[in-house]
């Protein structure tokens, strides 16, 4: 196997906003992308009709209202971090939005520690994210 890198041009059947699906990097708009790769590396691209926006999050009690400016359907990963800084896997969730809007209620337990919780909302393609606070 030859590890030498070479430039490869990828031509897609449609034009759109191109993302590197392995890193979340936005590569631009069009129907082609050129990358330098070796046989030891892989590439995976996504062509979307619209560019993915950073999520807009509003907190009301323990409920998150999540939307994006473009109104695109997308998927968000929601992570909850305790006041001690530990990610709480039991509250990690995926949220599929319709028309760019979705809602997630965090089902905190009565035994959860009091304090400020950080909620990280991540758009899964572009990996753009925002942080929100919820106080118990």
Question: For the regions a protein language model found, what residue spans apply to each?
Answer:
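Short, aromatic- and glycine-rich surface loops/edge beta-strands on solvent-exposed regions
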Residues: 43-47, 78, 114-126
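Aromatic/hydrophobic beta-strand junction motif of beta-rich domains
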Residues: 61-70
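Edge beta-strands of extracellular beta-sandwich domains
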Residues: 54-57, 92, 128-136
């Amino acid at each position: 196997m030859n590890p030498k890198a070479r430039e490869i041009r990828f031509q897609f059947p449609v034009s759109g906003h191109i993302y590197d699906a392995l890193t979340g990097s936005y590569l631009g708009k069009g129907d082609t992308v050129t990358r330098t790769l070796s046989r030891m590396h892989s590439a995976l691209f996504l062509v979307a009709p619209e560019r993915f926006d950073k999520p807009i999050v509003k907190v009301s009690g323990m409920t998150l209202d999540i939307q994006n400016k473009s109104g695109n359907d997308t998927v968000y990963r929601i992570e909850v971090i305790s006041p001690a800084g530990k990610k709480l896997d039991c509250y990690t969730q995926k949220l599929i939005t319709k028309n760019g809007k979705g809602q997630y209620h965090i089902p905190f337990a009565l035994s959860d520690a009091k304090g400020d919780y950080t909620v990280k909302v991540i758009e899964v393609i572009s990996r753009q994210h925002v942080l929100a606070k919820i106080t118990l």
